[in-house]
Amino acid sequence: EVVFEGDRLEPEFEYVAGQWGTVWLREGSNANIKHLTIKNAIVGLLMQNSTLTLNDSQIYDCSNYGILARVSKIVGKNNVLNSAGQSCLAVSIGGDYQFTHCTFNNNWNSNKQKAVLITNYEKNEDETITASDLVRANFYNCIIYGSNNVELFLDAIESVAFNYLFENCLIKFNDFGTRIEKEVLYDFIRK
């Protein structure tokens, strides 16, 4: 096992998020990672147009994201992403993602974070939209859970593809009385 964590090893810092930056997989990177533990980062793994195979790994206590992937490709098996200030897994501007036997659990102490966030676009500060096809975001036998009523956030624009599948997954989703109560992207959960 390889462990990336903050350099403060006293017990009171064990669960403190944001002690160091990120593991950055830059454009064109192709990584194969097994048995990795990331703790206390700002962003555990930051990906921009890169490819990752991630197996038997853990990402805990990140102040922003466990994994933030833009226009990337991830195949993940048997991973745990837990506690992040914004999202354990955030994929934006499309890409290609497959997760099997993974747990995404977010018990952060606010009501704004999500365990999993999936979009096919991103809006820049000047309101410009960057979009790309979400070729696939498939989750097989995964757990998506946390401290909020809705732990899965889907958001798409129609001009590019938005393909997703959740098969045999446990998803915490109680949307009664929320702004997404009638959103068709979530119809697969309500059936």
Positions of the model-derived regions?
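Beta-strand/loop edge motif enriched in small/polar residues
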Residues: 1-191
